[in-house]
């Protein structure tokens, strides 16, 4: 069976780790991964003719030494919209607020906005994902709500003053995630960390400050990486410099390692899973064994 469509939807991640696409294009690794499905090692055993696109995507994501770019959970986005944004309610006399998502990505926050019943403005320069986001909007969006999708970088979006009720996003990680090769991509347009921080990240935060109504919130989901060790600290400081007040930090649970302290790799080896907190930075994670957390910083105008 031809599973090329499963691979074509997997984007690349920068760094030393292999990307799912690289596993797909490597005959040795791809064969080894498929054999693990056929033999039931690490995956549910399936005969060749029963292997689905979903099985292939799962294998490519979980292959040893592989990482991929991720999508923000729509349920988590909807929860934040429910808390921070008004909805249409004749009983309470409120109307649906408007949110801006500076980096739309793969549509997790758009789906969350649709589920929460709020108006949505999103910006992102990536052409393929923009087309997919239009399909999400057209298929799942509500006719009585507004969903404005703009194919541009967030640093160039100039909102009307005090027109936004909430700004929420997970910005691209400089030197870690590559979502496309468009010249408007922030890591291409601003190709050094200092330039990216000043011209992209700070400008995006400044645009959010301009657009937000007084007392409303900006929420940014970021995390330090090996390539950008102070992403969290820099993000908070830039928001303070723009004029925001850092009023809270919420923790997003990314994954849970069930069972004991060992796991089996696709190569059939048993390895120890170290679950201790090895985070180095200012914002300490909750100390819950087996869980990985990222901060969502909450700022108030």
Where are these regions (language model features)?
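Single conserved hydrophobic/aromatic residue that forms the stacking wall/gate
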Residues: 2-7, 11
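Conserved alpha-helix/loop element of class I SAM-dependent methyltransferases that forms part
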Residues: 71-94
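Conserved proline-anchored active-site loop of SAM-dependent methyltransferases
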Residues: 77-79, 98-113, 122-124, 152-155, ...
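Short alpha-helix immediately C-terminal to the canonical SAM-binding loop
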Residues: 128-133
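S-adenosyl-L-methionine
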Residues: 134-159
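Mobile active-site "lid"/loop adjacent to the S-adenosyl-L-methionine
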Residues: 164-204, 226
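Conserved Class I SAM-dependent methyltransferase catalytic core
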Residues: 194-255
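Class I S-adenosyl-L-methionine
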Residues: 226-236, 244-301
């Amino acid at each position: 069976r031809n599973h090329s469509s499963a691979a074509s939807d997997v984007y690349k991640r920068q760094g030393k780790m292999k990307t799912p696409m690289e596993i797909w294009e490597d005959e040795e690794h791809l064969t080894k991964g498929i054999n693990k499905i056929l033999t039931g090692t690490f995956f549910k055993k399936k005969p060749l003719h029963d292997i689905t696109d979903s099985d292939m995507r799962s294998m490519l994501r979980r292959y040893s030494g592989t990482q991929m770019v991720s999508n923000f959970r729509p349920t988590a986005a909807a929860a934040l919209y429910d808390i921070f944004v008004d909805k249409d309610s004749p009983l309470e006399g409120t109307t649906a607020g408007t949110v801006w998502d500076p980096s739309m990505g793969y549509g997790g926050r758009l789906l969350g906005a649709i589920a929460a019943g709020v108006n949505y403005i999103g910006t992102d320069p990536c052409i393929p994902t923009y087309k997919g986001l239009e399909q999400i909007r057209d298929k799942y969006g509500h006719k009585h709500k507004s969903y404005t999708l703009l194919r541009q970088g967030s640093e160039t979006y100039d909102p009307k003053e005090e027109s936004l009720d909430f700004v929420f996003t997970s910005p691209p990680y400089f030197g870690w995630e590559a979502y496309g090769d468009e010249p408007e991509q922030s890591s291409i347009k601003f190709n050094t960390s200092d330039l990216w921080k000043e011209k992209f990240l700070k400008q995006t935060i400044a645009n959010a400050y301009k657009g937000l109504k007084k007392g409303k919130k900006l929420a940014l989901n970021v995390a330090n990486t090996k390539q950008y060790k102070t992403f969290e600290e820099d993000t908070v400081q830039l928001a303070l410099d723009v004029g925001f007040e850092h009023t809270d930090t919420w923790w997003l649970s990314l994954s849970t390692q069930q069972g004991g302290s060992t796991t089996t790799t696709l190569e059939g080896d048993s390895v120890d899973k170290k679950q201790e907190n090895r985070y180095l930075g200012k914002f300490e994670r909750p100390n819950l064994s087996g869980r990985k957390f990222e901060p969502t910083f909450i700022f108030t105008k």
